């Protein structure tokens, strides 16, 4: 854990390979330096016996940054290129500092024993000029459409217009109707325009219904948006602990997580060298990075919650903001008066941050200093454009505790704090539970929308049952899909190691894929424009026995291919009209194809073909003597 960073450290080769039959494309915005990444999945033509038509490429959201671009030069030691640096500088409202202003940051920088662990960043941190505000919300409320806003507008549309135009150009009206058909959704009041414009993005951010987490000290990040009127996003958690993991392992987890679709990453490190670990992650991350600053503050006082102070916490906020953290989980809603409400719970306070602040409140019998200093925190946030993720420190840790007085009291307070943050033009999202049975989930969403004025909701699951240790990625994905449908903007993944141990790379991938599935199911249920195109493409490939396209259009092509090849490994099986589930004689899709071919040969429709076929078999039965069984 304390070993020096390997100066030859490189990203895992598996994380930088393009996904099968995919390539990175960039859609240019109104200026040459707005290059929005997407993944293009190429498809095979439909076989001649099924119509012999061209299947144009499908475009999907891509969070992998330059790692999956063969043209990019990946060097973990140097970090990623500062994509947004020019945009930030051109606004003229921030300044480069002579050095770090955090006392702790300066101490780490000056410690020669840390030289082998340190990322050698050459540039100095930036901060807003005196009296200025550098948040995306501040710009939005002044009618300014930033490059970041245009970037996310293009990104959210997923090149859908180009896809539809390619279908129209082919002159195949049937294919156009087939691929763009989508069931009507139930959006529960969300506003889902057919096409996202930069102006729509600006309006949503100005109203507080969406955020773009984009610290001015994290110029490597590719802008993304979190809000219920946009695609549902997912977060992946990584981080070391006091007993396991290293810097290189955490960077590996980050690059692995974004390959499979993590829209943001939270570094929840609680072990040694938190500062250095975070620096390596930030400099190599194309997605926003979130943290829980109270974890590091606690390490600074040797794990004694009662020794925490506003001064230590403030220095930690500045330290992390100057490194480039894009959003902070702040447990300012854990008020002294709410702590006794948890006494009769089944599982008490399960949030680490919540329990830390509850212990501090009780030790001093004083109000939570995060609450009393909230406006001071806002001053720091707006100087760097760090977004609030207002923590649910009193979230239920069991179904028994769901939607209780403590949880809902804190949620009301988070709504009050949201309004204070908005007075400073600081971006806010609200964290949510937790462990909640399905019938109580909608109440959480409804109250959040009402009490928190439609600020984006960011939920951990929720886990819908407590009976499945080792399978909590599934128990939580059930609740995640449901609450995403109701309006949650971002889902925090849960891995199968939840409640059991620190996740490894395999667990990270399983958690990400599971939550991508939940988020997509929510987009479909809401009726998000274009959400069904990928489903339609995969279903068409499945019906036409285009096995490679089935694999490649899925969320995890590798697993799909491996499962297929366990029983049918030969290349010839990739063009077979069956799989090992039903075999060649009982494949429902093959039977349907046979019916269609018979109908075409008879010049009739499918229903008529079935009737004709039955009549022919009846005549054959009578001619054969009408015997129920033949002797063998």
UniProtKB/Swiss-Prot annotation:
Q: Which reaction does it catalyse?
A: 5-amino-1-(5-phospho-beta-D-ribosyl)imidazole + S-adenosyl-L-methionine = 4-amino-2-methyl-5-(phosphooxymethyl)pyrimidine + CO + 5'-deoxyadenosine + formate + L-methionine + 3 H(+)
MF-aspect GO terms = 4 iron, 4 sulfur cluster binding; carbon-carbon lyase activity; zinc ion binding
* Pathway(s) per entry: Cofactor biosynthesis; thiamine diphosphate biosynthesis
Q: Where does [4Fe-4S] cluster bind?
A: 579, 582, 587
Please state the span of the N-terminal signal peptide per the UniProt entry. none
Q: How is the cofactor bound?
A: Binds 1 [4Fe-4S] cluster per subunit. The cluster is coordinated with 3 cysteines and an exchangeable S-adenosyl-L-methionine.
GO CC annotations on file: cytosol
Q: Which keywords does this Swiss-Prot/TrEMBL entry list?
A: 4Fe-4S, Iron, Iron-sulfur, Lyase, Metal-binding, S-adenosyl-L-methionine, Thiamine biosynthesis, Zinc
**Pfam families from the entry?**
ThiC-associated, ThiC_Rad_SAM
Q: Does the keyword S-adenosyl-L-methionine apply?
A: yes
**Where, in this chain's numbering, is Zn(2+) bound?**
435, 499
Similarity remark: Belongs to the ThiC family.
- Spell out the subunit comment: Homodimer.
Q: What is this protein called?
A: Phosphomethylpyrimidine synthase
Q: Which organism is it from?
A: Chromobacterium violaceum (strain ATCC 12472 / DSM 30191 / JCM 1249 / CCUG 213 / NBRC 12614 / NCIMB 9131 / NCTC 9757 / MK)
């Amino acid at each position: 854990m304390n070993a020096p960073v390997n100066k030859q450290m490189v990203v895992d080769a598996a994380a930088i390979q393009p996904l099968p039959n995919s390539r990175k494309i960039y859609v240019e915005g109104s200026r040459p330096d707005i290059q929005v990444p997407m993944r293009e999945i190429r498809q095979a033509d439909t076989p001649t016996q099924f119509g012999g038509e061209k299947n144009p490429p499908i475009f999907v959201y891509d969070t992998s940054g330059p790692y999956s671009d063969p043209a990019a030069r990946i060097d973990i030691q140097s970090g990623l290129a500062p994509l947004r640096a020019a945009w930030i500088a051109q606004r003229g409202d921030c300044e480069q500092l002579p050095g770090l202003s955090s006392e702790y940051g300066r101490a780490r920088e000056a410690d020669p024993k840390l030289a082998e662990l340190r990322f050698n960043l050459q540039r100095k941190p930036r901060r807003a000029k005196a009296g200025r505000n550098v948040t995306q919300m501040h710009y939005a409320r002044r009618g300014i459409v930033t490059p970041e806003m245009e970037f996310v507008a293009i990104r959210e549309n997923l090149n859908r217009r180009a896809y539809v135009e390619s279908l129209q150009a082919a002159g195949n009206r049937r294919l156009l109707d087939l691929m763009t058909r989508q069931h009507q959704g139930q959006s529960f009041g969300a506003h889902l325009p057919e096409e996202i414009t930069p102006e729509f993005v600006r309006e949503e951010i100005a109203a507080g219904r969406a955020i773009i987490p984009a610290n001015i000290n994290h110029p490597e990040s590719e802008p993304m948006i979190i809000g219920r009127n946009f695609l549902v996003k997912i977060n992946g958690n990584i981080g070391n602990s006091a007993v396991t993991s290293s810097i290189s392992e955490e960077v590996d987890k980050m690059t692995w997580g974004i390959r499979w679709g993590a829209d943001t990453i939270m570094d929840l490190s609680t072990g040694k060298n938190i500062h250095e670990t975070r620096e390596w992650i930030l400099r190599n991350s194309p997605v926003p990075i979130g943290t829980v600053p109270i974890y590091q503050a606690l390490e600074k006082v040797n794990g004694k919650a009662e020794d925490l102070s506003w001064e230590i916490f403030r220095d930690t906020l500045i330290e992390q903001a100057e490194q480039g953290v894009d959003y902070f989980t702040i447990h300012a809603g854990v008020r002294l008066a709410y702590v006794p409400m948890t006494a009769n719970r089944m599982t008490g306070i399960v949030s680490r941050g919540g329990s830390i602040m509850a212990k501090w409140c009780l030790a001093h019998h004083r109000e939570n200093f995060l609450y009393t200093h909230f406006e001071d925190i806002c001053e720091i946030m707006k100087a760097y454009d760090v977004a609030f993720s207002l923590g649910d420190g009193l979230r239920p840790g069991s179904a028994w505790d769901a939607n209780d007085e403590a949880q809902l009291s804190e949620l009301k307070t988070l709504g009050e704090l949201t309004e204070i943050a908005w007075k400073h033009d600081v971006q806010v999202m609200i964290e949510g539970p937790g462990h909640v049975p399905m019938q109580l989930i909608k109440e959480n969403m409804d109250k959040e929308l009402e009490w928190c004025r439609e600020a984006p909701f960011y939920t951990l699951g929720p886990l819908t049952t407590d009976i499945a240790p080792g399978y909590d990625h599934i128990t939580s994905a059930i609740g995640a899909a449901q609450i995403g449908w109701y309006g949650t903007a971002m889902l925090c993944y849960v891995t199968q190691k939840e409640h059991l141990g620190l996740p490894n790379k395999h667990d990270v991938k399983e958690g990400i894929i599971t939550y991508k599935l939940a988020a997509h199911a929510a987009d479909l249920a809401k009726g998000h424009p274009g959400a069904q195109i990928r489903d339609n493409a995969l279903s068409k490939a499945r019906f036409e026995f285009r096995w490679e396209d089935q694999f490649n259009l899925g969320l995890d092509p590798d697993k799909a291919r491996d499962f297929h090849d366990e029983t049918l490994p030969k290349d010839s099986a990739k063009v077979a009209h069956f799989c090992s589930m039903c075999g060649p004689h009982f494949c429902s899709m093959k039977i349907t194809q046979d019916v269609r071919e018979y109908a075409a040969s008879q010049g009739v429709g499918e229903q008529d073909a079935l009737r004709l076929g039955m009549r022919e078999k009846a005549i054959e039965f009578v001619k054969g003597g009408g015997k129920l069984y033949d002797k063998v």
